[in-house]
Amino acid sequence: MAFRASGPAYQPLAPAASPARARVPAVAWIGVGAIVGAFALVAALVLVPPRSSWGLSPCDSGWQEFNAGCVAWDPTPVEHEQAVGGCSAPATLIPRAAAKHLAALTRVQAERSSGYWWVNGDGIRTCLRLVDSVSGIDEFFEELAIRICYYPRSPGGFVRFVTSIRNALGLP
């Protein structure tokens, strides 16, 4: 006599989950790994190099650093047209604020001088008198003045991002 069951021989306690839903897809793990890896890379770039490596780029050959810019000059006085055309791109004539600051720094030599500097006047003929750092338009200066070329240096967006994170974390 054979044993025969009246119902199914095996009844699962819970319905079977499909194997595709039970596991996290490999694509998701790759995505999470890429995000974590990118975060670790940015963290290493921010934390490992010293602050000095995130500074401004050096000035080109023949140029002197001046605050956040670079300056070059020719001590021979020239006319305005020569001064404007004598600065190679991306440099222009020194802006008025930077010229006043430079004049204040060189005031010791300037007190004995009655010279003038051409300054960037956005197309208007403008100069700065060295003795008292007064600037003007065709009012009091001679036809000749010294040309000082200037170009600003600014850090890129990623450098500003890194330095802001380092500042927020209080890192030196």
Curated annotation (Swiss-Prot):
Q: Signal sequence: where? A: none
Membrane topology per the record?
Answer: Single-pass type II membrane protein
Write the record's keywords in alphabetical order, separated by commas.
Answer: Membrane, Signal-anchor, Transmembrane, Transmembrane helix, Viral envelope protein, Virion
Q: Where in the cell is it found?
A: Virion membrane
Which named protein is this?
Envelope protein UL45
Segments traversing the membrane: 28-48
Indicate the family of this protein: Belongs to the herpesviridae HHV-1 UL45 family.
Stretches of the chain found on the membrane's Virion surface side: 49-172
Q: Which organism is it from?
A: Human herpesvirus 2 (strain HG52)
Query: What is the protein's known function?
Result: Important virulence factor of HSV neurotropism. Seems to be required for glycoprotein B-induced fusion. Dispensable for growth in vitro.
**Sequence ranges on the Intravirion membrane side:** 1-27
What InterPro entries does the database record attribute to this sequence? Herpes_UL45
A Pfam match: UL45
The lineage's top-level taxon is Viruses
The terms describing its cellular component in GO are: membrane; viral envelope; virion membrane
